[in-house]
Amino acid sequence: FCTVLALAKSSGYDCYALNINYQQRHSAELHYAKRLAEFYEVKEYKVVDIDLSWLSSSSLTNKSMDIPEIPSEGIPSTYVPARNTMMMTLALAWAETINCSDIFIGVNAIDYSGYPDCREEYIHSFEKMANLATKKGVEGSKISINAPLIRMNKAEIIKLGLEHNVDYSMTVSCYQPSKKGHACNKCDSCRLRREGFQKLGVKDPTLYM
């Protein structure tokens, strides 16, 4: 969210920020996202509430499941079925409502957990669908899905963010942070973030438990 927002702002876009409260365990991110939206003075910031707690196969929505702390082969339990498709569809609907032609998303397919909806081919396919399934698209106004971080590793993403003055102390990546937003330092997301700062050789401002 933060790195992509900073990048879009620096590229001259008028930014509208969308966040989804889907009853995820890591809802602390909503607090940080609001602060970032205010910091970057977005035109409008929306939070859409969707209860996905009934998607019981994901440890991000099923609180009776443990968040895995050891990387595993295959797609981990933190995968939420079709999450990015739902989020992108809401973003697409809002973009068409406000006559916006560019949608930015911060997915990454290098240092990631193996989610199928974070891959470059998924982004291309969604963009094709967006231009087939919307009034804006069929009338000839191309809708672009921008995923500028898709081919970057975590260290490269952090470096890019720092070059655009991103304050990473205002962000949280953890799948199971405390109510105060302190990261667990055990989950896959914490590991990837921590290793990114280590590889870059800069101090990690994350508050860990």
Predicted regions and their residues:
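ATP-dependent adenylation/nucleotidyltransferase module used to activate substrates
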Residues: 1-164
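Alpha-helix termini
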Residues: 25, 34-36, 178, 198-201
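Immediate flanking context of iron-sulfur cluster ligation sites
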Residues: 164-185
